[in-house]
Protein backbone atom coordinates (compact mmCIF):
# COMPACT_ATOMS: atom_id res chain seq x y z
CA UNK A 1 0.00 0.00 0.00
CA UNK A 2 2.86 2.38 0.80
CA UNK A 3 4.28 1.77 -2.67
CA UNK A 4 1.08 2.90 -4.42
CA UNK A 5 1.06 6.17 -2.45
CA UNK A 6 4.68 6.79 -3.37
CA UNK A 7 3.83 6.19 -7.02
CA UNK A 8 0.75 8.42 -6.80
CA UNK A 9 3.01 11.19 -5.53
CA UNK A 10 5.24 10.71 -8.56
CA UNK A 11 2.33 11.35 -10.91
CA UNK A 12 2.72 15.03 -10.15
CA UNK A 13 5.99 15.04 -12.11
CA UNK A 14 3.96 15.32 -15.30
CA UNK A 15 2.73 18.69 -14.09
CA UNK A 16 6.28 20.05 -14.21
CA UNK A 17 7.50 18.53 -17.46
CA UNK A 18 6.32 17.50 -20.85
CA UNK A 19 4.81 14.02 -20.97
CA UNK A 20 6.57 12.78 -24.08
CA UNK A 21 5.76 9.14 -23.21
CA UNK A 22 2.04 9.83 -23.50
CA UNK A 23 2.46 11.67 -26.80
CA UNK A 24 4.58 8.87 -28.28
CA UNK A 25 2.11 6.19 -27.15
CA UNK A 26 -0.78 8.15 -28.67
CA UNK A 27 1.04 8.60 -31.98
CA UNK A 28 2.04 4.90 -32.06
CA UNK A 29 -1.68 4.08 -31.87
CA UNK A 30 -2.30 6.52 -34.75
CA UNK A 31 -4.66 8.56 -32.60
CA UNK A 32 -5.15 12.30 -32.71
CA UNK A 33 -5.55 14.18 -29.46
CA UNK A 34 -9.28 14.45 -30.25
CA UNK A 35 -9.63 10.71 -30.86
CA UNK A 36 -7.89 9.87 -27.59
CA UNK A 37 -9.99 12.45 -25.78
CA UNK A 38 -13.17 10.87 -27.16
CA UNK A 39 -12.04 7.42 -26.01
CA UNK A 40 -11.33 8.58 -22.45
CA UNK A 41 -14.21 11.05 -22.11
CA UNK A 42 -12.00 14.12 -21.90
CA UNK A 43 -11.47 17.16 -24.09
CA UNK A 44 -8.81 17.57 -26.74
CA UNK A 45 -7.53 20.54 -24.76
CA UNK A 46 -7.08 18.36 -21.67
CA UNK A 47 -5.05 15.78 -23.60
CA UNK A 48 -2.93 18.54 -25.10
CA UNK A 49 -2.28 20.10 -21.70
CA UNK A 50 -1.35 16.74 -20.18
CA UNK A 51 1.12 16.15 -23.02
CA UNK A 52 2.62 19.60 -22.44
CA UNK A 53 2.88 18.99 -18.69
CA UNK A 54 0.50 21.83 -17.90
CA UNK A 55 -2.36 19.79 -16.48
CA UNK A 56 -2.31 17.33 -13.62
CA UNK A 57 -4.84 14.60 -14.48
CA UNK A 58 -6.77 12.66 -11.90
CA UNK A 59 -5.78 9.07 -11.23
CA UNK A 60 -9.06 8.02 -12.84
CA UNK A 61 -8.21 9.86 -16.06
CA UNK A 62 -4.70 8.40 -16.03
CA UNK A 63 -6.18 4.90 -15.80
CA UNK A 64 -8.59 5.56 -18.69
CA UNK A 65 -5.76 6.92 -20.85
CA UNK A 66 -3.50 3.96 -20.05
CA UNK A 67 -6.27 1.50 -20.92
CA UNK A 68 -7.09 3.29 -24.18
CA UNK A 69 -3.43 3.15 -25.21
CA UNK A 70 -2.93 -0.43 -23.95
CA UNK A 71 -0.18 0.76 -21.61
CA UNK A 72 0.43 0.66 -17.87
CA UNK A 73 0.43 3.70 -15.62
CA UNK A 74 4.16 3.15 -15.21
CA UNK A 75 4.62 3.24 -18.98
CA UNK A 76 2.94 6.62 -19.31
CA UNK A 77 3.06 8.57 -16.10
CA UNK A 78 5.52 7.42 -13.48
CA UNK A 79 9.21 8.09 -13.65
CA UNK A 80 10.92 4.95 -12.40
CA UNK A 81 14.20 6.15 -10.91
Regions found by a protein language model. Name each.
Residues 43-55:
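Recognition helix of helix-turn-helix/homeodomain-like DNA-binding domains
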Residues 35, 46, 75:
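Residues in the helix-turn-helix
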Residues 24, 59-60:
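Short, Lys/Arg-enriched C-terminal cap helix and immediately downstream tail that follows
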Residues 1-17, 28:
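N-terminal flexible/basic segments that precede or flank functional cores
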Residues 60-75:
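DNA major-groove recognition helix of helix-turn-helix/homeodomain DNA-binding modules
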Residues 20-39:
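Short basic helix-loop element that most often maps to the first helix and adjoining turn
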Residues 52, 78-81:
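Short, conserved catalytic or interaction motifs in soluble domains
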Amino acid sequence: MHNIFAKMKNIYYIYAMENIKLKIARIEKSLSQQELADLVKATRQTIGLIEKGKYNPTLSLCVRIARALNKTLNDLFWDED
